[in-house]
């Protein structure tokens, strides 16, 4: 059974934006419960929703954290220009 942790954590993101405005997240970092900075290198983007008529772009990505493959749900807010992590799945 997969465990899912719902969170709302601001993240620092390194992403690439092409000339058409398509965003590709590459690496992000955040503070864990112990206030340690955790850096995550994104291995694969599983799904994306970048509808420019909405408030932001949603990404589901897979990456390794603490030696285990995890799924992360990330959101970029077009108006606030900020990235947030909303879910971590195991």
Where in the sequence are the language-model features?
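Cysteine-centric segments in proteins
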Residues: 1-90
């Amino acid at each position: 059974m997969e465990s899912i942790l719902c969170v709302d954590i601001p993240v620092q993101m390194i992403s690439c934006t092409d000339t058409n405005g398509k965003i590709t997240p590459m690496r992000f970092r955040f503070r864990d419960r112990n206030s340690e900075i955790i850096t995550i290198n994104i291995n694969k983007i599983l799904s994306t929703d970048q509808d420019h008529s909405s408030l932001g772009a949603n990404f589901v990505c897979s990456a390794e954290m603490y030696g285990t493959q995890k799924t992360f749900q990330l959101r970029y807010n077009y108006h606030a220009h900020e990235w947030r992590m909303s879910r971590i799945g195991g």
